[in-house]
């Protein structure tokens, strides 16, 4: 075979374009033709951490006032009928109840962390109440 002289050709600047797969082409064309955009979602745990920071900063009561007041009156009915409550008495009960629950959940969280978990479970609450001596 005889040798031939090679002439220099102009470079096109890279590789030749490849054919796209059918799925990729369909995915790229879908939003352009009016596909429905997904609503924005935060990663799991982000909103939870934001809520923790928000509620730790705040001082307002978290249990609604009227449902708590109805519960207090319902429990009081079992002991004596026709009891009246000052609004400040119901507020004091609510403050005490919320403080108790916050402390309970703090200790419950510590029990879950001790068990190398991040999720609190009923057994954590039971352990806390046994350690505190509230329930034998």
UniProtKB/Swiss-Prot annotation:
State the residue spans of region: Disordered. Answer: 1-43
Residues found modified as N6,N6,N6-trimethyllysine: 5, 10, 28, 37, 57, 80
Do you know which SMART domains this protein is assigned to? H3 (SM00428)
Q: Which residues carry this modification: Asymmetric dimethylarginine?
A: 3, 18
List modified residues, type N6-methyllysine: 5, 10, 19, 24, 28, 37-38, 57, 65, 80, 123
At what positions is Symmetric dimethylarginine found? Answer: 9
Q: Which residues carry this modification: Allysine?
A: 5
Q: Which residues carry this modification: N6-butyryllysine?
A: 19, 24
Q: How is it modified after translation?
A: Acetylation is generally linked to gene activation. Acetylation on Lys-10 (H3K9ac) impairs methylation at Arg-9 (H3R8me2s). Acetylation on Lys-19 (H3K18ac) and Lys-24 (H3K24ac) favors methylation at Arg-18 (H3R17me). Acetylation at Lys-123 (H3K122ac) by EP300/p300 plays a central role in chromatin structure: localizes at the surface of the histone octamer and stimulates transcription, possibly by promoting nucleosome instability. Citrullination at Arg-9 (H3R8ci) and/or Arg-18 (H3R17ci) by PADI4 impairs methylation and represses transcription.
Keywords, A to Z, come to: Acetylation, ADP-ribosylation, Chromosome, Citrullination, DNA-binding, Hydroxylation, Methylation, Nucleosome core, Nucleus, Phosphoprotein, Ubl conjugation
Give the modified residues of type N6-succinyllysine: 15, 57, 80, 123
Which residues get modified to 5-glutamyl serotonin? 6
* Listed PROSITE patterns: HISTONE_H3_1, HISTONE_H3_2
Modification sites for Phosphotyrosine: 42
Q: Which residues carry this modification: 5-glutamyl dopamine?
A: 6
Query: How would you summarize the oligomeric state and partners of this protein?
Result: The nucleosome is a histone octamer containing two molecules each of H2A, H2B, H3 and H4 assembled in one H3-H4 heterotetramer and two H2A-H2B heterodimers. The octamer wraps approximately 147 bp of DNA. During nucleosome assembly the chaperone ASF1A interacts with the histone H3-H4 heterodimer.
Quote the function comment for this protein.
Core component of nucleosome. Nucleosomes wrap and compact DNA into chromatin, limiting DNA accessibility to the cellular machineries which require DNA as a template. Histones thereby play a central role in transcription regulation, DNA repair, DNA replication and chromosomal stability. DNA accessibility is regulated via a complex set of post-translational modifications of histones, also called histone code, and nucleosome remodeling.
Q: Which family does it belong to?
A: Belongs to the histone H3 family.
Supply the name of the protein.
Answer: Histone H3-7
């Amino acid at each position: 075979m005889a040798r031939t002289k090679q002439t220099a050709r102009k470079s096109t600047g890279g590789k030749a374009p490849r054919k796209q797969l059918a799925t990729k082409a369909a995915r790229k064309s879908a939003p352009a033709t009016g596909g429905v955009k997904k609503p924005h979602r935060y990663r799991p745990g982000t909103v939870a951490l934001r809520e923790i920071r928000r509620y730790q900063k705040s001082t307002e009561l978290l249990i609604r006032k009227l449902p708590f007041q109805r519960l207090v009156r319902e429990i009081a009915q079992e002991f004596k009928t026709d009891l009246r409550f000052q609004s400040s008495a119901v507020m004091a009960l609510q403050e005490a109840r919320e403080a108790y629950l916050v402390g309970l959940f703090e200790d419950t969280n510590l029990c879950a962390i001790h068990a190398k978990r991040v999720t609190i479970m009923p057994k954590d609450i039971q352990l806390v109440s046994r350690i505190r001596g509230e329930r034998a």
